[in-house]
Amino acid sequence: MHFSSGIVRPPYEAGSCFLQVTSGCSHNKCRFCTFYKEAPFSVSPEREIREDLQEIRDSGWKVKRIFLQGADPFLLSYSRLKRIMDLIKEYLPWGVSVGGYGRVDSVKNKSVEQLKSLKEMGYDMIVFGIESGDDAVLDKMNKGYHASDIVEQLSKMDEAGMHYSVIFLYGLGGHEYGMGHAV
């Protein structure tokens, strides 16, 4: 299996199979995050994805769920995500659901119709690290987007009927920004 930036996953994905389709983080500028500091962002070549899917199939594990690796696999274009799902179905034809991390701005390049289509294909969850809903905290932490972007993109997810979860970092505002962050 190809894992160039290690495995990072939410606790509830512990039983999932992991497939690297990107490595590192496309933004990689958040002040608090060290997960991907040593891993430049890159997209896994199709050959590596095929090799990993072949290895999963050969293991005999009847995988039910895949959690895509990399901080931002949903930054990939709709057509690339479709191709990845086609490969998953080719190698694991019994049907699996797929989720992964995504930045809020990574779904900006996808229409509601494309998000609906991704859901129908089997992509059923994006985990967004929003961290805060306060613009001052988002700016201080160098997230690269604002609360209005969060609302806009998650509303698009709602309209598409695609599930998501969010990571909120309690205490991120510290003493100076704590009240705005908490509210």
Regions found by a protein language model. Give the residues of each.
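Short microdomains enriched in Cys/His and/or Lys/Arg
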Residues: 44-60
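Conserved SAM/AdoMet-binding glycine-rich loop
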Residues: 57-152, 159
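An acidic, carboxylate-rich microenvironment
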Residues: 47-48, 80, 149, 181
